[in-house]
Amino acid sequence: MFIVMTIVFFLVNSTGQTPLSATSSKDLEAVKTQLDAFGFNDPLIVRYGRYWQTLFSGSLGTYYSSPNQTIDQIVFGRVPNTLYVVLISFFIGSLLGIIFGMISGLFRGKLIDAVINVLVVLFVSIPSFVVGLGLLKAAGLFRLPPRFINFDDANFNFGNFLLASIIPILSLVFYTSAAFTYRVRNEVVEVMNQDYIKTARSKGLSTFAVALYHIFRNSIIPSVPLFVFGISGAFSGGFIIESLFGVQGVSRILIDSVQSNETNLVMFNIMFIQGIPLLASVFIELIYVLVDPRIRIASAGGVSLWTKLKFVYLRQAWLRKWRRINHTNSHNVLFNSPQHRQLLELKAIDYKHNTISLTEQQKTTLKIEPTANFVLLGTKCLKIITIHG
């Protein structure tokens, strides 16, 4: 994201455009003064550094054309229009893609599979704006509104709003559904060749039961990452669709702000558009854990980072302790030997703290050398604590 924002910053500011314009010589002087106050006359690298400094201080910067408005108010005021078109089209497109992908995979080699494959190739190849232009022509035949009605329009009417939503949403649905159909169909074909599908059929399960309980889930799991790319693709297609159908959304703001060199507005738009797929990928990872039992099993049987660090620390402590031991400061005791039994009778061994508590007389009785600080009992290294009195 940082690299993308850096490239966009320098590209936008290399156009020579300014966000303010003048209609007279008097206005020109005022505009020059204001541009100087905004720092437009500073070197580009200085403005770049100032932008990041402002951003990390918690400010999105100034909207030059109207300093009284904040950047977040402008963008988030248009977000509902964008999310409505993008998310609805993505939901419908992915649902249709899964359905047609399942049908195409289950009936591979049949006429319906061939027809679906032709349509998939067609709609994947044709850009969304070309589909949109074709739908604009069709809108007149079905008496559908050619322009989108935004949420903040003065003449907003829910019935007309739904009718005006059909064409923009369909423009994005075709590509999304085609992409999902292609991926799901390939996964279905691969799953159908697995041994557990043959086993399910040999048990007498119907085709519907096999498809629903075995093929469907195992085909969808590998297709989950496609949801992230699908959302990114829907946002990318939204740039042209919003311009084509008059959707006052985030993409439309981005286009206008680039043309007027509203750098701060452009950068926040890029952050927002880049952030949506990022959040979607995090959400998809969480979904993966729910739908894929292999991940749950691996997580349950795996070792956390904290546990790994704990093991490393304990191992290093164990090595340090053994480095201090030599033949002069340690005494070997074999399991079930007379010495071991005597220690058990004395209840001198503390396995919890890896210590042995003995008096000087007990050490003499057990024939433990006075210089010994440790007792080696099997794989245990027990520190000797001398009890006085």
UniProtKB/Swiss-Prot annotation:
Gene3D superfamilies: MetI-like. The chain crosses the membrane at residues 1-21, 83-103, 115-135, 161-181, 220-240, 270-290. SUPFAM superfamilies: MetI-like (SSF161098). It comes from the Bacteria. Residues 79-289 form the ABC transmembrane type-1 domain. CDD domains: TM_PBP2. It is found in: Cell membrane. One of its GO terms (cellular component) is plasma membrane. Its main location: membrane. Keywords: Cell membrane, Membrane, Peptide transport, Protein transport, Transmembrane, Transmembrane helix, Transport. GO terms for biological process: peptide transport; protein transport; transmembrane transport. It is a multi-pass membrane protein. Part of the ABC transporter complex OppABCDF involved in the uptake of oligopeptides. Probably responsible for the translocation of the substrate across the membrane. PANTHER family: INNER MEMBRANE ABC TRANSPORTER, OLIGOPEPTIDE TRANSPORT SYSTEM PERMEASE PROTEIN APPB. The complex is composed of two ATP-binding proteins (OppD and OppF), two transmembrane proteins (OppB and OppC) and a solute-binding protein (OppA). Belongs to the binding-protein-dependent transport system permease family. OppBC subfamily. This is Oligopeptide transport system permease protein OppB. It comes from Mycoplasma pneumoniae (strain ATCC 29342 / M129 / Subtype 1).
